[in-house]
Every structure is written in structure tokens, then in C-alpha cells.
Amino acid sequence: MTREEARRRINELRDLIRYHNYRYYVLADPEISDAEYDRLLRELKELEERFPEFKSPDSPTEQVGARPLEPTFRPVRHPTRMYSLDNAFTYEEVLAFEERLERALGRKRPFLYTVEHKVDGLSVNLYYEEGVLVFGATRGDGEVGEEVTQNLLTIPTIPRRLKGVPDRLEVRGEVYMPIEAFLRLNEELEERGEKVFKNPRNAAAGSLRQKDPRVTAKRGLRATFYALGLGLEESGLKSQYELLLWLKEKGFPVEHGYEKALGAEGVEEVYRRFLAQRHALPFEADGVVVKLDDLALWRELGYTARAPRFALAYKFPAEEKETRLLDVVFQVGRTGRVTPVGVLEPVFIEGSEVSRVTLHNESYIEELDIRIGDWVLVHKAGGVIPEVLRVLKERRTGEERPIRWPETCPECGHRLVKEGKVHRCPNPLCPAKRFEAIRHYASRKAMDIEGLGEKLIERLLEKGLVRDVADLYHLRKEDLLGLERMGEKSAQNLLRQIEESKHRGLERLLYALGLPGVGEVLARNLARRFGTMDRLLEASLEELLEVEEVGELTARAILETLKDPAFRDLVRRLKEAGVSMESKEEVSDLLSGLTFVLTGELSRPREEVKALLQRLGAKVTDSVSRKTSYLVVGENPGSKLEKARALGVAVLTEEEFWRFLKEKGAPVPA
């Protein structure tokens, strides 16, 4: 490569990487995979090393992240800079890292390291003064981030107050979305025809940057902490391992794995072990972070413009494969929603063959601009669900075909209806809807009918033995014995499981019946609020809106279903069959008609107190108004206390609150 060619390629790479930094760090909507980004950055770094005359302090190799062009939140300067990490992809690069340490420190290796999971989330910085949280911010460009304090405080494990810490303290960590929460969120977004997230990291970033903290609170975010900025010297800590234990002791969640390792060989052993456990983790990890354990050596080594010299990110191999989209088929779910599924040329990803991939909904297809015949880059989102990362448009030949949505249901032939970006089959007798409804009803998280698998459901429907879930409770042993591969013992076991499912409670039943927008959490909230199916069936829109996590669209959809004669008939038949229609949690009318607001820090988790009040029939709201009956005040109350006094609302200290409940005859936690 000539000098001029190198200059042009370096400038091209810098522009490209800056663009992708903005997509990743600011918009939380990357266009390329992590592996592709790493390749671009490595190419730029190698060219800058070969042609040092073109190095520049504003190069992406010398900078961290990206600063928002138009901040959604208030920009805030970090008291001390937040750095990125240099990457290693092979054992040889880890060995080279240790050799650099040996030369820089003038000491013989091996060195002692702490090796930690590299959680794939969003880096944040918490700043405390005299033990009180002042703000929480995203990393941004390392010097200036966005203040997201209120959204961070929706993560219940983040402490607001600390004891026995330096007067000024920065605590650094990662906000992430557990894989289970990510899959659940995407399912809800897909059901509504909205844009889904590509991976848990994007979902975490998008959720943390919501303007409304109540939306953030519903997303199931978690956090794990691993570093100090300001206050590290004053802490008196001697090692990274000790620092992690100190963070735990002070009440910070340290949810990632970590181990000590001696030398590059020891690091490799831990890396291999963590890699093997990767898909058993509740979060996405894209590698390990290797840090010298001795903090005194950190001071000797210092930092480059971009990263510490004493630490390294040792990345897991990227499991991304190129393949072709051969066709698209359409599947019908239990609500009648039609989902496009891509048929791929089979590829092997993370231990299994992938030949199908969900294309979610019309919004997703339009955004990707994906066509039949396209080459695509595929990975497993959350290490579980095959997903298209991007379309390789540069490989198009002109023979690719656009995806056409069917006008009629692929299962029953009924004309589809379109609701926003969602296509649905409205036919209540559609066999696919019946199959999916029964399969969902019997699933482990719903009524948990062990032995009622997909093949058996198909046979029951084919033979006309069941039409819907209520028919399950009228099956007889002789009905089952007439089915292929069904013996006496299997039939008895299945009937016993069906009988046991009658007693799962209203929480599980509401989830099992597939009310629109109702997942496990919302089903539990509805059961807790109303207590019985009869009460729920008579609920008004206003009452549904009082339930935690119910927005107006969901409330209207639930209400429409509750008023549907077919749904009411199904509930009646289930009730006649002996299925429990009551919550397993006791609900009373003891505080019916009263409205509570909670403020400040209580001795028990706020959600627990809120749930208790709701079980006693009270309404719990977030803001004080003239309709508020009582404001319950914990330590460090906010402006709600002043507003309550101005409006003449009754105020209870926490001690008075528990005494009030006892006097009412309510069960009070010990």
C-alpha cells in the first residue's frame, strides 16, 4: 500500500467508525455487528501503526464512544474520565499484553490478574457526595455523558445512600437487560407491530434513555458494578478482587462472575471456562475483562488517550454466519397474529443448525429492506433466538424478490385484517389459533400440563376431541386410549396433570388465557388487584388503568376481551369444570376507596409495600393530588411532602403507617 492509499483509507475508516460510534453509543441502533466493528477498528489501528505520520488525537483509536449531537438528557461532565478497553481476540495477543507489562514495569511475569465477565450492556457512572447519590450518567464520549439518574433509580438494586465511603465517589458499572426480559420485551413489541430490539444491549440502552422513567421501570433492567473512579485512592483498597468484594459490602450489585488468574496461561483457563458457560448465563457476555489485580501497578502504568494500560478485553469469538434467505413462510399465532418466518440455507451457529429465522412483523421487514434471495448475516440474539443482523446489500444481483404479505390466512383461508403493522386472522375457528391457544395454555409458565405436547394437541384437534382449552377438562381415559402411542399409564398421567392444573390460581389462568398484552408480571398484577375472575370481568377502564404496568392501549384491549361474549363463555365453561378463578394471594376490601402515595426510603422494598396495599384493596399512585388519602413518608422525602401539606393531605410516618394497618386488622410483615 502506498502512502497516499494509506492516507485515503485511514480517513475513510475514521469517518466510517465515527458514524458507527454514533449509531452504537448515542442512537443505540447499530447497523453492523460487534465483530464487523472490531475488524474496522483493528484495520485502522494497524494502518496508524504502519504510517505514524497520519496519527491524529481525534482518531477513533484515541477516543471513547461518542457525544450526543442533540442530547435527549442533560449533558453532565464526569468528575474523572471514563475509558474504553483495548481488545484481544487470541491467546497470543494476551501473551503479548503480558510481555508489554513486563517491559513497562521492569518485573518478571507471571502477574496476578482478576478476570471478569464482560457484560454486554451500557456503561454508567454513579457519583456520590458524602454518601448521597448526586447523579447517574451514561459514559458518552468518556468526558461528557447524559444524566439518567431517575431512570437508573428504577433499578431497585442501585443504592441511593452509602455509609463509610470517601466523601466524593464515582462507581462504574454496566446496565444490562437479562436475556429473559429481552425476549419478553421483544415479544410484546412484536405483538404490537412495533420495532423490536436487535439484542439485549440495544434494548438496555433504549430502555435507559426513555424520557418517562415509568417505561424504564417496566423493562426489567439490572446493573452490575466493577470499578471506582474518584475515591479509589481514598478507599484504601489494594487489589481489584478486594474492590469487587468492597462494592458488594457497600450494597452494590456485582452480578457478573470473576476469578483470580496467574499469568496469561491462567487467564486462558478462566477464559475457556467462562466461554463454555456463556449460554447458561442470564445476561449476554461478549468476552472477559482482564485486569492486573494489584492497584499499585495501575498507578505505575497509567493510561493511553483511550484505554488503561493495565487492562484488556479478551473477546469471545463472534458467532455470525452469512447465508441466503430462500423463502418466507407465514405462521399464525394464538391471537391470530401472522408472523413472517425466513427460510434460510442451513448454517451452524453456536452448536446448532439454523434454518429458520423470525422476521417479526412488517415494520422489521421494511426497516431491513430484506428480500427473498438476499444474502444475510445471522446470529443468535441473546444467545438463543436466530436473528438477521443485517442484509448484505452489496451482494445483490437484481434477482431478489420483495416479500409479499398474504391477503388470506395461510391456515384457514379467511381474509386477514390489518391493525397498524400487524396482520391478523379474525376467524375464531382458525385451526392454527386453536392449536397455539391450547399449546400456550398448557405451557410450563401457564397451567403447566406436563405431557400435553404439540403432537398430542394436533391429534386431539384432528379427532375433534377438543375445540378449545375448556374441552381439556372433559377428556376421558377412553378418549385418550384411542389415540396413537397413548397407553394406559400415559393416559392416566395426563388426566392427573389436567386435574392438577385446575388449582394453579387466577395469576396463572390469566396468563394462560392469553389476554392481549398480558404476560406473567401483568397477569400477577391483575390477579393481585382484583382477586377473582368475577371482579375482573366487571372492571372498568379506570380500574384497569390503576393496575401497575397497564397503559391505556393495553387497558382498552383487555377490556374489549373481557366484554367479548365468546371469552365470557369460555370462562364460564372453565369455571363449571372446576378451574380456580381466585388469586392464590389473599385480597380484601379492607382499604377499599383509599388512595396512598409513597415517598422517601422505606424499611421494606417499595414494591412490596405497594403490593400489600393493593392486596388490601387500596389504590397506590405516583403523585399527590386532592384525591390522595394518605402520603406515607420514609427517610429523605422529596417534594411530595410539601405538596401534601399544601393540599391538606394526611401524612403518615412509616411507623404510623404500620400502626395504622395493624389497627385496621391488616396482616403486617414482621
UniProtKB/Swiss-Prot annotation:
Domain BRCT: 586-670
One cellular component term from this protein's GO annotations in UniProt: cytosol
Superkingdom of source: Bacteria
Cofactors demanded by this protein: Mg(2+)
Chemical reaction(s) catalysed: NAD(+) + (deoxyribonucleotide)n-3'-hydroxyl + 5'-phospho-(deoxyribonucleotide)m = (deoxyribonucleotide)n+m + AMP + beta-nicotinamide D-nucleotide
PROSITE patterns in UniProt: BRCT, DNA_LIGASE_N1, DNA_LIGASE_N2
Keywords: DNA damage, DNA repair, DNA replication, Ligase, Magnesium, Metal-binding, NAD, Zinc
Record GO biological process: DNA repair; DNA replication
Known EC number: 6.5.1.2
Residues annotated as binding NAD(+): 34-38, 84-85, 116-119, 139, 174, 226, 291, 315
Residues that bind Zn(2+): C409, C412, C425, C430
Thermal dependence summary for this entry: Optimum temperature is 70 degrees Celsius.
Active site per the UniProt annotation: K118 (n6-amp-lysine intermediate)
Keyword hit for Hydrolase: no
General function of this protein: DNA ligase that catalyzes the formation of phosphodiester linkages between 5'-phosphoryl and 3'-hydroxyl groups in double-stranded DNA using NAD as a coenzyme and as the energy source for the reaction. It is essential for DNA replication and repair of damaged DNA.
Cited NCBIfam families: dnlj, PRK07956.1
Family annotation (HAMAP family): DNA_ligase_A
Protein name: DNA ligase
Gene behind this protein: ligA
